[in-house]
């Protein structure tokens, strides 16, 4: 792995597709590092928040992984060649692996092709990650066994907002969409409160109502549960983008 690859991607990827390199609030992180405890800790920090990780090993092929490397849990391993990919699959059979050749070391690709492949990889990883998150949310909502579409939709949006809070990235449109849904929906308030209790998000919902009142356009009359401007509300305010 040449040291210039991360800079090549960061400096040029935005010209290929929709990927934008950011310093804060990433949707996906590409980690370049050695098989080490430090790398493991870095990746676990992102995956714990629910941020997908692509990992490129900076020290290439290794015959035996040290014990701490078993902690490594990237969403996808990027390898520069098939030999490295085969070794990863041998050591970690369940790993998701993608081979993208480094244009600095082979004539089988060029910079534009390589960047396009990384762009497509990032888009695919993010899309699949979001689909998995939504599937998990839908499964939780289905456990309510409620036919009221409005309650199901509101609970789904609250659960996604809870996930976004864990990622420390709350987009303003999420708040505005939830405000709109609450304002334009008719539902049984008692059933709604029971649903929030069943999902164990009643406390979180009270914090969200205060957030929507201060940072979006929701008013008290459209709240399914009383607002509470508490510590959680203040923490969420810090992560609105």
In which residue ranges do the predicted regions lie?
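N-terminal subdomain of nucleotide-sugar transferases
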Residues: 1-21, 51
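Short N-terminal targeting/anchoring amphipathic segment
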Residues: 20-38, 52-58, 168
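Short glycine-rich, flexible loops that bind phosphorylated cofactors or substrates
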Residues: 36-38, 62-63, 86
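A conserved, positively charged/aromatic
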Residues: 61-75
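A short, active-site helix/loop in glycosyltransferases that binds the activated sugar's phosphate group
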Residues: 72-96, 106
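A charged, aromatic-enriched C-terminal amphipathic alpha-helix characteristic of glycosyltransferases
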Residues: 101-122
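Conserved NTP-donor binding/palm subdomain of two-metal-ion nucleotidyltransferases/polymerases, i.e.
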Residues: 117-241
């Amino acid at each position: 792995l040449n040291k210039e690859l991360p800079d090549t991607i960061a400096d040029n990827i935005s010209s290929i597709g929709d990927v934008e390199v950011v310093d804060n609030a990433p949707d996906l992180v590409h980690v370049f590092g050695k098989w080490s405890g430090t790398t493991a800790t870095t990746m676990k920090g992102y995956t714990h928040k629910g941020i997908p990780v692509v990992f490129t090993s900076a020290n290439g092929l290794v015959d035996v992984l040290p014990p701490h490397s078993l902690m490594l849990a990237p969403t996808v391993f990027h390898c520069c060649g098939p030999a490295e990919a085969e070794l990863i699959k041998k050591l970690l059979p369940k790993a998701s692996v993608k081979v993208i050749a480094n244009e600095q070391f082979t004539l089988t690709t060029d910079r534009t092709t390589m960047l396009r492949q990384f762009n497509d990889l990032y888009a695919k990883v993010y899309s699949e990650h979001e689909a998995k998150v939504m599937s998990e949310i839908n499964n939780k909502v289905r456990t309510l066994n409620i036919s009221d579409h409005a309650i199901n939709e509101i609970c789904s949006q609250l659960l996604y907002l809870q996930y976004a809070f864990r990622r420390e990235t709350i987009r303003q449109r999420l708040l505005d969409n939830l405000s709109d849904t609450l304002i334009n929906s008719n539902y049984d308030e008692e059933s709604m409160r029971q649903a929030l209790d069943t999902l164990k998000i009643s406390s979180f919902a009270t914090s969200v109502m205060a957030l929507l009142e201060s940072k979006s356009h929701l008013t008290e009359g459209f709240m399914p549960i009383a607002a509470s401007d508490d510590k959680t509300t203040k923490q969420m305010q810090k992560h609105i983008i």
